[in-house]
Amino acid sequence: LLFKEGLRIMIFKEELRKKFGKESYEVELFKREGFERRQCRSCNEWYWTTSDNEFCGDTKCVGGYKFIGRRIGGGWDFHESVKNWCDFFEKRGHTRISEYPVVARWRDDIPFTIASITDFQPYVVEGIVEPPANPLVVPQPCIRFGGKGFNDIDNVGKTGRHLSLFVMGGQHAFNYDGKGYWMDRCIELNFEFLTKCLKLNRDEVSYKEDVWAGGGNFGPCLEAFGRGLEIVNNVFMQYAFTSNGTYRELDIKVIDVGWGVERIGWFTQGSPTIYEATFGPVLDWLKESTGVSVDEELLGRYTVLSGLLNVDEVDNIDKARRDVAAKLGIEQEDLHKSLGPLEALYAISDHTRTLVFAIADGGIPSNIGGGYNLRIILRRALSLNDLYSFELDFLELFHKHIEYLKKTYRRVEAASNIINDLSLIHISEPTRLLSISYAVFCL
């Protein structure tokens, strides 16, 4: 089902872009603030800006991240990012609802909650069931293993921003019976948060036109960028795919905004990667336990460019890595020797956090369905541990995550006894040897 939907999206992408012209994206704020529609000199996509910059703001188009080392106030940790984002919208008429499980038990087409809108598909979006509030916000943990050949997983630790589980700040309004709001109000709120909370100047904000689809629905979207980072995607859900390969208009128009909550924290801290901002004391413990240290000056220069290494977006990843190394004035092999162990810790911390959330919500590593994906990341974490001879106590690591996360997501405590009972770290030696080969392949 996911493959069929992905195929439909690819087929319709260009057609939909033609359908959604300038008039589909121009909101009142653009007119009032003097935003102009331009075509990016790098990717040729259309975007809106108040500056004379010829680039859309996407990481690869502007040459990397431009906010590294630029702390905003005291910076927000993971918990502060969730709270401050929710508080902003609650003060502006939104109701915060409890997040849904990451294991999508109410869906028969996907194993995991992949976006906050998943919580409301298909029944709320189709008007069959009333939304729990309107408008609403939900700090929804999401799991994604997508990409060609698990490339999303391969990106973890390398691009500085990829996570297999992330918290999507879902901002939703359902337009019916005079309730909800539409594009103008959506971008008003969006721009206010970016400029007042994240302290971006007007000229630093750009909105890139695109089309987003997921869960059988789609619509035009405006991706908001600041200093080389996509912070939020504003989707204006208006259509549904049909069984005969076409599409129809939805009776209820839905504001489907997905904020990258971990990205917000990363942006405010200006830390080298999203992992320092997200995992906090857990990553500190990992570094202390393994003795991994790194050239901070090299790491600082590298992470600015690391966003250019997205496996899904680069035709030749080896060449891209060589190019990054060349810009840093270092051989690719030496760069890997310097940063490889740290990138492995990033991946291990990500994968184990994902497992904690999934297991707390009833997911178990196995050979079938979504459980197979969980097994993949478990094996990859164990493999990287073996490859670099970290000798980590994984049971302790899982409990470190639980202790840190429970401040905001108390339900992760449910994973504690299950992890102990499953003995997840007791894997046979032949399997571990195969896993080491897998880890080497992924490097």
Give the location of each predicted region.
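Structured aminoacyl-transfer and RNA-binding surfaces used for tRNA recognition/handling
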Residues: 66-376, 385-401, 410, 414, ...
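Short, flexible, mixed-charge glycine/proline-rich loop motifs
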Residues: 27-35, 46-50
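Single conserved hydrophobic/aromatic residue that forms the stacking wall/gate
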Residues: 425-429, 433-443
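Aromatic/basic-lined ligand-recognition segments
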Residues: 381
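Short, intrinsically disordered terminal segments enriched in charged and Pro/Gly residues
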Residues: 6-31
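Short cysteine-rich clusters marking metal-coordination/redox-active sites
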Residues: 40-43, 56
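Cysteine-rich micro-motifs
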Residues: 51-64
